[in-house]
Amino acid sequence: VAASRLVLRIGVPFENAWLPRMAQLAPAAKVVDLRDGLTMRPVDLPPGAAPGTGGTPDPHVWLAPPLVMRMADRIRDELIALRPEAKTEFEANHARFIADLKALDGDIRSRLAAKKVRNFMVYHPSWGYFADAYGLRQMPVEAGWKEPGPRTLQMVIEGARQSGVRVVFVQPQFSQKEAETIAQAIGGEVVAVDPLAPDYIGNLRRVADIFARNLQ
């Protein structure tokens, strides 16, 4: 760590805890915020939640391939500035990754293009940038990392019924209790999708397939 010359951050909350320590261990390292130049969105909230409850901005920028392409450009440029002798290698790696991202982006668009119901319900609001990129709308259950109260839960259920939602998406890192309650109330089901899976390309293909099978 002490020999690090470049630190890339993406804006997830835990970075705020370790970046000061990183600055002590590697004082010469350049810190690059990959969100710079991106249009950030607020965190989506369930009905009845107070503005700002979820914190802002939404940190989940990596779930939109078009935004990841822009971040990849920045990483390439920073690496070339750091090691100009490896420019050819960095550019080749970048080109392959961008080609994979473009193929992924096109595949997701084709899978979701014909869906008439564009709303989907999630327990934790991780998928806002993904929704923006592909013309969808996420409807969250949770606000500010807190479980919904009875009033919010009822409003969420009514919103799901009015929007034609039949699936509640959850991620493995969170409790499924409230999601199962909502699914039972709307005659739907709970389906797991993981925004933190290590295989980025493969995972988003699986997520797109899950969305395509569960959106009407």
Task: Name the predicted role of every residue range.
Residues V1-Q216:
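Extracytoplasmic metal-acquisition and chelation regions
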